[in-house]
């Protein structure tokens, strides 16, 4: 059966429009002639498609550029304020939110403490499975109410724009399926929470939910320490530990989309019991939670107090942070031996302790990795500090919007 030429032409136009938009996104400022050279499309086609993008408020003319002779070309820019995106990092004990434009520039941000159900906070051992499930759902509902409130506040901060809010991205500390359902978040004690569905019904906007460490990896790759680096492992060190794996510049998610749960890699065969059901998990020894458990014996209750004491050269606190760095480095050594990455980026809240962690982490990695694996590998701390995940979550929303534009939806 012969395909209608009009259908062919419409498809070709969609493809070519996507090519031109991608050129502007990656290489702006540039001229129509430069787009033609980059893409191989003829100048008339480029001129027509650029005008469509200008009419769609996605591309702007930015005045004349340089010329080697003759008429100066009109330079083109992507219109980053054509719309805005909301990013959320849903932590175990906090919610961090951000409103960004479509180039990732921060417009507004907020952070709130997140209180867990009081009975769960006290670690009450609940034998009744139905009662435990009821508390889990209550806990999730309370957190989602706070999350919704944060999103509403950020949306109100958005300036007027042609596309308004293009989407919402959320990073969560747990296993998420393709439908945005949180299957299991051990540190939140959540199971089967349909977060994407609830937020889409509430806001009527596209919502993307992913693991917090994956969001952090995307944030650092797009805006931070991982820019231009093909193979990188992002290690999110907060209440727990998660990893985002980027191979050949693409986020690796595994067969079912659940890769990166290396915080539950066993480093002690018969070690402490973990909320995931395993024993001896890496995050029990190398996370913020592990640090705070040990710091409580010294009379400290928060990471902020510990950082202040370390800055004042409290030897006990510095030694404690470095001992956490030993465990962190041991786990990173395993990652390096398995993946042979260009860089390992340490992020989330514990990245704030970089100056005390780094010597211990580096020493452990040097001691425990195979020599050829560590030869060109670098350990970095997140350029975005504890904002990697929220920036990456916002990027998910922007990326989803671009995918729809490029496919002609």
Task: Please report, for each region that a protein language model flagged, where it lies by residue.
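ATP-binding/phosphotransfer module of carbohydrate and carboxylate kinases, centering on a glycine-rich
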Residues: 1-123, 127-164, 203, 269-273, ...
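Phosphate-binding/catalytic loop of phosphoryl-transfer enzymes
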Residues: 88-90, 102, 166-284, 289-292, ...
């Amino acid at each position: 059966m012969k395909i209608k030429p009009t259908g062919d032409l419409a498809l070709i136009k969609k493809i070519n429009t996507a090519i031109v938009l991608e050129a502007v996104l990656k290489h702006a400022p540039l001229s129509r002639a430069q787009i033609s050279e980059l893409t191989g499309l003829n100048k008339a086609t480029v001129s027509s498609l650029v005008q469509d993008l200008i009419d769609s408020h996605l591309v702007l003319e930015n005045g004349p550029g340089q010329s080697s002779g003759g008429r100066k070309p009109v330079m083109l820019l992507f219109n980053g304020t054509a719309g805005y995106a909301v990013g959320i990092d849903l932590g175990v004990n906090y919610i961090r939110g951000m409103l960004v434009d479509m180039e990732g520039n921060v417009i507004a941000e907020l952070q709130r403490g997140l209180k867990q159900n009081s009975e769960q906070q006290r670690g009450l051992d609940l034998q009744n499975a139905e009662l435990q499930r009821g508390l889990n759902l209550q806990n999730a509902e309370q957190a989602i109410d706070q999350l919704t409130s944060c999103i509403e506040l950020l949306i109100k901060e958005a300036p007027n724009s042609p596309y308004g809010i293009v989407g919402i991205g959320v990073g969560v500390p747990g296993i998420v399926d393709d439908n945005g359902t949180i299957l299991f978040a051990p540190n939140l004690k959540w199971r089967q929470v349909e977060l994407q569905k609830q937020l889409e019904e509430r806001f009527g906007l596209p919502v993307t939910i992913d693991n917090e460490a994956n969001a952090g990896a995307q944030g650092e790759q797009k805006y931070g320490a991982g820019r231009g680096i093909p193979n990188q492992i992002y290690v999110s060190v907060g209440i727990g530990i998660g990893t985002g794996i980027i191979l050949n510049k693409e986020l690796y998610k595994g067969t079912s989309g659940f890769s990166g749960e290396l915080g539950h890699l066993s480093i002690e065969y018969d070690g402490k019991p973990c909320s995931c059901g395993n024993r001896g998990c890496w995050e029990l020894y190398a996370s913020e939670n592990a640090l705070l458990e040990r710091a409580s014996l010294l009379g400290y209750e928060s990471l902020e107090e510990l950082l202040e004491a370390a800055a004042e050269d409290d030897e006990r606190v510095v030694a404690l942070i470095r001992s956490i760095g030993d465990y962190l480095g041991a786990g990173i050594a395993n990652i390096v031996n398995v993946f042979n990455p260009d860089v390992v980026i340490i992020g989330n809240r514990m990245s704030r302790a970089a100056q005390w962690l780094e010597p211990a982490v580096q020493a452990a990695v040097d001691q425990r990795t195979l020599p050829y694996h560590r030869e060109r590998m670098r350990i970095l701390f997140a350029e975005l500090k504890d904002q990697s995940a929220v920036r990456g979550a916002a990027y998910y929303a922007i990326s989803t919007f671009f995918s729809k534009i490029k496919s002609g939806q």
